[in-house]
């Protein structure tokens, strides 16, 4: 176990990981949202997690690479494709995690597999991520849903840092479990990675109707922004909560 893991006391989930992938040029765009708005959109079995009483949502555009199952090579055609996640923060029986409203990806097989085997709300979208120096131009338009579109230009503007435990930065980024529901049953999946090496970021989000498509109205204030250059992630099997 590496020094960075030891310093942050991040434990490895039980069992054997089944999938790995790499996230590149990740933008975290965070907005405070009224608890009452999110409560109506999140399954009642989950408790909304708040930081000093405030609920948050986050959008994460990034480029996904090296998607593969354990012991197998990279999935054909999945060497690199964009993904865009919309999420909020929840707990279940004291265990913090995230809940996804949507995950857009520009890879039909990945979308089908995630919907079928992980019961996650993936959508197929036309997407493009272009990098020029340290600046990224990112465009997404969901297929068959013209209202779910996103366009942002972003770049890092600080030296890398790891978030201090108990800080808002840490609370928003260091999450190692996702929750989802299927046929009125609660499921969870654990992930594992190094602590995020973050940078402050600037972004111009010129189009964002993804939140509108899910009934979430964003505040007029600017989002809190972070950037991460790269993160290797391991995934454990989806489990039903007994």
Swiss-Prot record:
Query: What S-S linkages are listed for this chain?
Result: none
Listed InterPro entries: ADC_dom_sf, DUF2071
Gene3D superfamilies, A to Z: Acetoacetate decarboxylase-like
Query: PANTHER family this protein is in?
Result: DUF2071 DOMAIN-CONTAINING PROTEIN, DUF2071 FAMILY PROTEIN
Tell me what this protein is called.
Answer: Uncharacterized protein YqjF
Q: Which organism is it from?
A: Bacillus subtilis (strain 168)
Question: Source gene?
Answer: yqjF
